[in-house]
Amino acid sequence: MAEEVWMGTWRPHRPRGPIMALYSSPGPKYLIPPTTGFVKHTPTKLRAPAYSFRGAPMLLAENCSPGPRYSVNPKILKTGKDLGPAYSILGRYHTKTLLTPGPGDYFPEKSTKYVFDSAPSHSISARTKTFRVDSTPGPAAYMLPVVMGPHTVGKVSQPSFSIKGRSKLGSFSDDLHKTPGPAAYRQTEVQVTKFKAPQYTMAARVEPPGDKTLKPGPGAHSPEKVTLNKPCAPTVTFGIKHSDYMTPLVVDVE
């Protein structure tokens, strides 16, 4: 008996699914856009006209008004409110009393020079002070620059020399013992290099803010003279007495 050749664990069987090695094209791997319908239509083909369907429209006989929800005044028309004339009663307006001049503020006897022709008259007054003061500068108001010395203006100055005393620094009379003493140096405060002690300031007493104006007292008011809420008592005014010997000025004469 010849020995059987070992063929391994694989045995011929029916495949459970498609084997991609058996296909030369990708096959159903790619989804081609459809040529029917409207959604996802292929862009390489013309698309046929499509129609949309919807429900039946609403009935026209249906009432779309809010109904008796709003209470409309029956007196309101398209031209406005239909009412009769109405009047309102208010208080009398308070008219401001103007301070007009009275008869005593006029002097008609002084108006003759404005109404009738008068002779020319001249007025004599004191001499004005503006002509006495001469506003032009005098000879003493000018200060001419000097023409001598090194500080000449507009001129060429000659060389000048200054003479001063001889310095004792480095000379035979220089006193070498004059060195600065302890009092020649300024003493530095201790608080600059050491801890500074606490300091307190004493100020004046602070008064609280208040109103210090003068207020009227009880004697400054006169309630008996107030007639805002009560009728005013009758008052009589007196005028001036006109003279019987002076003819009044009559302007409007026709």
Swiss-Prot record:
Instruction: Give the family per the record.
Output: Belongs to the CIMAP family.
In UniProt terms, what function does this protein have?
Outer dense fibers are filamentous structures located on the outside of the axoneme in the midpiece and principal piece of the mammalian sperm tail. May help to maintain the passive elastic structures and elastic recoil of the sperm tail.
What else is on record for this protein? Answer: 'Shippo' is a Japanese word for tail.
- Give the keywords, sorted: Cell projection, Cilium, Cytoplasm, Cytoskeleton, Developmental protein, Differentiation, Flagellum, Repeat, Spermatogenesis
Q: How does it assemble?
A: Microtubule inner protein component of sperm flagellar doublet microtubules.
Q: What is this protein called?
A: Ciliary microtubule associated protein 1A
Where in this protein does the record put region Disordered?
Answer: 207-228
Q: Which GO terms describe its cellular component?
A: cytoplasm; outer dense fiber; sperm flagellum
Entry's localization field: Cytoplasm; Cytoplasm, Cytoskeleton, Flagellum axoneme
| Tissue occurrence | Testis-specific (at protein level). Expression restricted to the germ cell fraction, absent in somatic cell fractions such as Sertoli and Leydig cells. Expression detected in the third week postpartum (23 days) after haploid germ cells developed, expression increased with age. Expressed in the tails of elongated spermatids sticking out toward the tubular lumen, and in cytoplasmic droplets still attached to the spermatid tail membrane. Expressed in the tails of mature sperm, from the connecting piece proximal to the head, along the middle and principal pieces, down to the distal end piece.
Q: Which GO terms describe its biological process?
A: cell differentiation; flagellated sperm motility; spermatogenesis
- Pfam family for this entry, one: SHIPPO-rpt
InterPro entries per the record? CIMAP, SHIPPO-rpt
STPGR repeat start and end residues: 180-205, 216-241
